[in-house]
């Protein structure tokens, strides 16, 4: 099958959607012809994958975000026509999706779309006008109504899309795992332990992702303050970078957490990132914005359970007190659960082992679920 995946977020950008597109495209390419259609990034990067990548002209918005102009990209359009896709899968809803819908209509092929993001929350972060936000949501729903099938990665997102006014069917297909399963965990963690001087730390907590306010990191830091005030020693690793790096570093300084917290910055070395996961004992993820965060899956692959907030997409893979922890959206309860978890390291290890067994899902399984959907749409 010839499959074209359209996305506004791809490598060398950093984020969950980028990882999801890479994982899905790689798995689909095992037995299919796949092309990923994405914006051109100005920094040097070589596309070296099992699948083809077509880059559309774009302009830089941030270091991680580019606005694509596929309608004016002659080479891009020529190569896509040559590829001649049988189905198009949109992984975002911005300019690339608009072109995908236009191309599909002209060539009479089906389009499906996976929605990864709570767009209203994302829009409201940067746009103060409710009128403009509502207009953007209305435009999103208009696009959703033009595709053959809408997918998302969590049940929480089904309600989110309904709140936008979308009334069509939404199916949940969860993301796959990015790392392979870890067989030599003690060896894997040595690199991070040495680099960040963690050998004598009693309790090591971890977060991997963008360092931004909407990830609810202030919630985490306030919980850490409670834990420190109880006289508990720990080291917290914030792995990643973002617009609010300085804000959170200053907050940690203000709360007297400088000696307890390490901001590693962005980690692009896969071995070091894997080692950081392995060194952690508990993954702190109180985000109410994320839907099916791959970082929780990656932590689980390293036998590290997550603590999340109840009734969020982040918590859906977790069975409370079995494969991780789920608490109310309350800083005190979050802190209490962390303290409870680290008070019995043998039980915490059991929960981490169960997380490794039950939370990850292979990308090959996700790809097969989508292939079944593609075949059904093409033949009907």
List PLM regions with ranges.
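Conserved acidic donor-binding segment of nucleotide-sugar-dependent glycosyltransferases
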Residues: 320-321, 325-331, 340-345
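N-terminal subdomain of nucleotide-sugar transferases
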Residues: 1-44, 49-55, 364
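Aromatic "clamp/platform" in nucleotide-sugar-dependent glycosyltransferases that forms part
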Residues: 288
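Short alpha-helical donor nucleotide-sugar binding micro-motif in glycosyltransferases
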Residues: 266, 274-280
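Short hydrophobic beta-strand element within catalytic cores of glycosyltransferases
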Residues: 305-308
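A short, well-ordered alpha-helix in the C-terminal region of glycosyltransferases
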Residues: 333, 340, 347-361, 365
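Nucleotide-activated donor-binding/catalytic signature segment of Leloir-type glycosyltransferases, i.e.
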Residues: 249-267
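Carbohydrate-associated surface elements
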Residues: 40, 156, 176
